[in-house]
UniProtKB/Swiss-Prot annotation:
Region feature Headpiece, mapped onto this chain: 735-827
Chain positions found as Phosphoserine: 366, 735
Written domain comment of the UniProt record: Consists of a large core fragment in the N-terminal portion and a small headpiece (HP) in the C-terminal portion. The core fragment is necessary for both actin-nucleating and -severing activities, whereas the HP binds F-actin strongly in both the presence and absence of calcium and is necessary in actin-bundling activity. The Gelsolin-like 1 repeat is necessary for the actin-capping activity. The entire core fragment is necessary for the actin-severing activity.
Protein name per the record: Villin-1
GO cellular component, one term: actin cytoskeleton
InterPro entries: ADF-H/Gelsolin-like_dom_sf (IPR029006), Gelsolin-like_dom (IPR007123), Gelsolin-like_dom_sf (IPR036180), Villin/Gelsolin (IPR007122), Villin_headpiece (IPR003128), Villin_headpiece_dom_sf (IPR036886)
Annotated GO MF terms: actin filament binding; calcium ion binding; cysteine-type endopeptidase inhibitor activity involved in apoptotic process; lysophosphatidic acid binding; phosphatidylinositol-4,5-bisphosphate binding; protein homodimerization activity
Gene giving rise to this polypeptide: VIL1
Subcellular location: Cytoplasm, Cytoskeleton; Cell projection, Lamellipodium; Cell projection, Ruffle; Cell projection, Microvillus
LPA/PIP2-binding site 3: region residues: 816-824
Protein task: Epithelial cell-specific Ca(2+)-regulated actin-modifying protein that modulates the reorganization of microvillar actin filaments. Plays a role in the actin nucleation, actin filament bundle assembly, actin filament capping and severing. Binds phosphatidylinositol 4,5-bisphosphate (PIP2) and lysophosphatidic acid (LPA); binds LPA with higher affinity than PIP2. Binding to LPA increases its phosphorylation by SRC and inhibits all actin-modifying activities. Binding to PIP2 inhibits actin-capping and -severing activities but enhances actin-bundling activity.
Length: 827
């Protein structure tokens, strides 16, 4: 019987973020060494556990991977072990079924350098990767722009096509052949994979050569080797288009209720997109079908034990019934331990008894009471995580310039109107703050709900012009009326006023209302604003403070549920609304004139406001593209700064605001389409997102701490020393002389390339550095080849002795190698 062994339980990591992998061997879980992570056999099945840390919370994912040539018994064992591991973790894990060739983005994300799938398996005597083994011949087909998967294919030109990257691995030589229609990123990923094989599997003692398919004549010696090994070159196949998933398909959600209460399993459709969390009952199990792309099974914590146990089988039966491909991805979600991806398929997802971060943006009627927090502005940059959570780059004490869109042009706003935002206008506000005496800029684009479409368009256009005047350094923040972020409010020190309509233009003929009512929200100078509402009694709320301005007086109405801090901030902002003396009115003690000004008494919200819902917000990073003529967003799991490519644009979704990051070498069309791209993302989001979500445009090299704080260990100097594809290619020594290797390989038949040849000789025994440096031949330890002393060193000693890595050394011309060995006492 398949059962999780005590040895596996004892070695199971449950506290430290990271990955563990086991291979199914003779129906048992056998650990895979870390230097073999990312290498899989198509005849085997594997179990992978990943632990992630978000804040102080740990989350668990368990995947079982099915090789296309694996046996049914091995597949069944992997599935059972996955369930048992989840049981051992007390139901805290998300379970994933992965099938070769259709792995999830989450799975691929664990292997940033790429995945290599090899032929064979444990049944045919195949072992995991052995370091320094050169008895290898294989052709790898590299697929994928970001997290690549390289599978072994037939060693023949027939396997090639014009659009992909291929690695011909011959032990001590790896040739990367780039299809003439492959793109820059595919070539870079292929090169990184080739270097990974060289450094991890061969200890750096392998040459890597690159052939660009559009210019094969530039690499005659490498092409001679390829033709010798692969046979005579024939016409190449056309490029094969990558599979594109339509966003609409991702948003096509259907929820099914699963029950076996009648003695047989009954699956019944109960809802379609948009979905809400209250559709899920703790007593039952459910299947969520995402357009046939992925199947989720949600297991209620109080559901029937048998239903829980059969969850995976129910999903597989569902796939068969729907005639979906057998490789369809499956995820099992435990009640209370749902993944962020699953949660965001719903309109909103809340978790009881979990505190939330500060500084969410809200509209009137759903505004949360924000606890006052004292912070030092400089700490926002020392601790960007705090800045990201609070959405504050500083305390709002920087320099301010403000313009209004008038006749589609920028007109400076009179000083007396700073902090006043009229719903019939659009404004640009440039905020300047300094870090170590260097200026940084935020460009707010505030768009009134009653502004014309021409003015809204002009505000975006003028923002681009202003951005260019400041060398494209400002961070652009689109702010729809009612979505004002905390930092914008902090600039006006508790005196920000938002009017329903109207304008602050000097020549305006629009009449000013004789009676105005403002709802005040906020507890400090950093989070307070007054928002105009309809002047009638029904607009009141017992939890808040309101300002009622009439022609004769100004009332400050204090609801029974408001706090002392809220009353004090309301008094401050009331002076901005009206210069007249304020009459404080306590709820229940209103004078007759108060109700008269509001058109008479009427029912209003008087129940105690519920505590703010604990929305679960997990930041998600997406690579964006519109190169195919339609918007595509590819998620990057477990993201870090390295995932931000200079040639691309990315979208960072933190739910109540969305960042759009632009790499310095990004496509011009993608740069210009920032707002459109984010809007398209929000429209096609299966969670039914608010299209008025604030959009923040960030350029590479000018990231504010509110952005960098979502990344672990952000390095502001990372791109100063980054290397291009051309730089990496030059490092490989492709301009060198390949004649010796060419002669070695082409002097014998392809099948003779093995560890017995000079080129592919196996690893030599390792000795301490001090036993090899500056020693005459007779004093060398037994077994040392005097002419190859450097090959008897560990990688660490090699690097210390020669001042470079083995891979860099082997890329040097032979004469340079010899001179360096003489200089370092290894000749």
């Amino acid at each position: 019987m398949t059962k999780l062994s005590a040895q596996v339980k004892g070695s199971l990591n449950i506290t430290t973020p990271g990955v563990q992998i086991w291979r199914i061997e003779a129906m048992q879980m056998v650990p895979v060494p870390s230097n073999s992570f990312g290498s899989f056999f198509d005849g085997d099945c594997y179990v992978i556990q990943a632990i992630h840390k978000t804040g102080s919370n740990l989350s668990y994912d368990i995947h079982y991977w099915i090789g296309q040539a694996s046996s049914q018994d091995e597949q069944g064992a992997a599935a059972i072990y996955t369930t048992q591991m989840d049981d051992f973790l007390k139901g805290r894990a998300v379970q994933h079924r992965e099938v070769q060739g259709n792995e999830s983005d989450t799975f691929r994300g664990y292997f940033k350098k790429g995945i290599v799938i090899r032929k064979g398996g444990v049944a045919s005597g195949m072992k995991q990767v052995e370091t320094n083994s050169y008895d290898i011949q294989r052709l790898l087909h590299v697929k994928g722009k970001r997290n690549v998967v390289a599978g072994e294919v037939e060693m023949s030109w027939k396997s090639f096509n014009r659009g992909d990257v291929f690695l011909l691995d011959l032990g001590k030589l790896i040739i990367q052949w780039n299809g003439p229609e492959s793109n820059h990123m595919e070539r870079l990923r292929g090169m990184n994979l080739a270097k990974e094989i060289r450094d991890q599997e061969r200890g750096g003692r392998t040459y890597v050569g690159v052939v660009d398919g559009e210019d094969e004549k530039a690499s005659p010696q490498l092409m001679e080797i390829m033709n010798h090994v692969l046979g005579q070159r024939k016409e190449l196949k056309a490029a094969v288009a990558d599979t594109v998933v339509e966003p609409a398909l991702k948003a096509a959600l259907k929820l099914y209720h699963v029950s076996d209460s009648e003695g047989k399993v009954v699956v019944r459709e109960i809802a379609t997109q948009p979905l809400t969390q209250d559709l899920l009952s703790h007593e039952d199990c459910y299947i969520l079908d995402q357009g046939g792309l992925k199947i989720y099974v949600w297991k209620g914590k109080n559901a029937n034990a048998q239903e829980k146990k059969e969850a995976m089988n129910q999903a597989l039966n569902f796939i068969k019934a729907k005639q979906y491909p057998p490789s369809t991805q499956v995820e099992l979600q435990n009640d209370g331990a749902e993944s962020a991806v699953f949660q965001q398929l719903f309109q909103k997802w809340t978790v009881p008894n979990r505190t939330t971060g500060l500084g969410k943006t809200h509209t009137v009627g759903s505004v949360a009471k924000v606890e006052q927090v004292k912070f030092d502005a400089m700490s926002m940059h020392v601790q960007p995580q705090v800045a990201a959570q609070q959405k504050m780059v500083d305390d709002g004490s920087g320099e301010v310039q403000m313009w209004r869109i008038e006749n589609l042009e920028l007109v400076p706003v009179n000083t007396k109107w700073l902090g006043h935002f009229f719903g019939g206008d659009c404004y640009l506000l440039l905020y300047t703050y300094f870090i170590n005496e260097k200026p940084h800029y935020l460009l707010y684009i505030w768009q009134g709900s009653q502004a014309s479409q021409d003015e809204i368009t002009a505000s975006a256009y003028q923002a681009v012009i202003l951005d260019q005047e400041y060398n494209n350094e400002p961070v652009q923040i689109r702010v729809p009326m009612g979505k004002e972020p905390p930092h914008l409010m902090s600039i006006f020190k508790g005196c920000m006023v938002v009017y329903q309509g109207g304008t602050s233009r000097a020549n305006s003929v629009e009449p000013v209302p004789s009676t105005r009512l403002f709802q005040v929200r906020g507890t400090s100078a950093n989070n307070t604003k007054a928002f105009e509402v309809s002047p009638r009694a029904a607009s009141l709320n017992s939890n808040d403070v309101f300002i009622l301005k009439t022609q004769s007086c100004c009332y400050l109405w204090c609801g029974k549920g408001c706090s002392g801090d809220e009353r004090e901030m309301a008094k401050m902002v009331a002076d901005t609304v009206s210069r007249t003396e304020k009459q404080v009115v306590v709820e229940g003690q209103e004078p007759a004139n108060f109700w008269l000004a509001l058109g008479g008494k009427a029912p209003y919200a008087s129940t105690k406001r519920l505590q703010e819902e604990n929305l679960v917000i997990t930041p998600r990073l997406f690579e964006c593209s519109n190169q195919t003529g339609r918007f595509l967003a590819t998620e990057i799991p477990d993201f870090n700064q390295d995932d931000l490519e200079e040639d691309d644009v990315f979208l960072l979704d933190v739910w109540d605001q969305v960042f759009f990051w632009i790499g310095k070498n990004a496509n011009e069309d993608e740069k210009k389409a920032a707002a459109t791209t984010v809007q398209e993302y929000l429209k096609t989001h299966p969670g039914g997102r608010d299209l008025e979500t604030p959009i923040i445009v960030v350029k590479q090299g000018h990231e504010p701490p509110t952005f960098t704080g979502w990344f672990l260990a952000w390095d502001p100097f990372k791109w100063n020393n980054s290397k291009s594809y051309e730089d990496l290619k030059a490092e490989l020594g492709n301009s060198g002389d390949w004649s010796q290797i060419t002669a070695e390989l082409t002097s014998s038949k392809p099948e003779a390339f093995n560890a017995n040849s000079n080129l592919s000789s196996g690893p030599l025994p390792i000795f301490p550095l001090e036993q090899l440096v500056n020693k005459p031949t007779e004093e060398l330890p037994e077994g040392v080849d005097p002419s190859r002393r450097e090959e008897h060193l560990s990688i660490e000693d090699f690097t210390r002795a020669l001042g470079m890595t083995p891979s860099a050394f082997w890329a040097l011309p032979r004469w340079k190698q010899q001179n360096l060995k003489k200089e370092k006492g290894l000749f």
